[in-house]
């Protein structure tokens, strides 16, 4: 581990919760502040709102008093509501139609980890001059670097439309590498917020390291709210 990535953590904090900060909450913070530059009271659409990054976005977005719409399966709607979001059943409701009915001019920003057709529809849900932050391409049929390349090309194409909207990629590992000062400052802030219980990472499951296959299956099935954490047994 490079020493510039190491930070002190109070002993009393739950290691599983601290682990959630390193990717999920850093990503959410990057989306809201560094890339999205969200202001208090704005309206946003959060896809996969009951997932690890989604619940982090809900909690950090709540501190900004954002009005938050979040897509999730019905069984996870209580989680979305608990953290201040308005749930949308993406399996039985057209999220774009729902947003257009609720916010005719469009939301200020949309956060999309899915890509493909979903990213294009997220773009349509955003008002003129709004922004779409992409942070993954989970819905694309291709894998690896090809998946990433296609997603980036799609974002570039959307940015050519003359409606003032912008589509931006948030790739947290890349942000950490190129801006270590941001990483250290932001993670230190998040650790302090956790210690003060201003944020409460949602741990959907704690799985022994030897059962890593089961953890991946849980993620693929999408039936866990929050983060799946691998635990090293004594």
Residue ranges and their predicted role:
Residues 1-48:
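NAD(P)H dinucleotide-binding glycine-rich loop of Rossmann-like/cofactor-binding domains
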Residues 34-38, 101-104, 124:
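Glycine-rich helix-loop-beta junction characteristic of Rossmann-like nucleotide cofactor-binding loops
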Residues 117-196, 231-234:
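Glycine-rich phosphate-binding loop and adjacent beta-alpha segment
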Residues 45, 108-111, 133:
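N-terminal Rossmann-like NAD(P) cofactor-binding module of classical short-chain dehydrogenase/reductase
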Residues 41, 84, 105-108, 199, ...:
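Local beta-strand N-terminus motif with an aromatic residue
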Residues 62-121:
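Adenosine-nucleotide cofactor-binding segment
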Residues 50, 54, 58:
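N-terminal Rossmann NAD(P)H-binding glycine-rich loop of SDR-like oxidoreductase domains
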Residues 191-206, 213-234:
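C-terminal capping/lid region of NAD(P)-dependent oxidoreductase domains
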């Amino acid at each position: 581990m490079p020493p510039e990535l190491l930070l002190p953590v109070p002993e009393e904090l739950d290691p599983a919760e601290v682990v959630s900060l390193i990717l999920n909450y850093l990503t959410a913070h990057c989306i809201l502040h560094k890339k999205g530059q969200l202001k208090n009271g704005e309206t946003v659409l959060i896809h996969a709102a009951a997932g690890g990054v989604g619940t982090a976005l809900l909690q950090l977005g709540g501190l900004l008093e954002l009005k938050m719409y979040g897509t999730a399966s019905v069984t996870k709607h209580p989680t979305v509501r608990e953290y201040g979001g308005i749930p949308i059943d993406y399996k039985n409701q057209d999220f774009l139609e729902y947003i257009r009915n609720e916010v005719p001019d469009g939301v200020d920003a949309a956060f999309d980890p899915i890509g493909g057709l979903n990213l294009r529809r997220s773009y349509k849900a955003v008002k003129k001059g709004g922004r779409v932050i992409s942070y993954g391409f989970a819905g694309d049929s291709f894998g690896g670097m090809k998946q990433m390349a296609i997603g980036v090309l799609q974002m570039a194409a959307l940015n050519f439309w003359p409606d003032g909207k912008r589509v931006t990629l948030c790739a947290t590992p890349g942000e950490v590498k190129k801006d270590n000062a941001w990483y250290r400052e932001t993670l230190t802030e998040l650790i302090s917020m956790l210690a003060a219980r201003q944020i409460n990472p949602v741990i959907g499951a704690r799985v022994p390291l030897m059962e890593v296959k089961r953890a991946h299956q849980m993620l693929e099935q999408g039936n866990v709210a929050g983060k799946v954490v691998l635990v090293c047994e004594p």
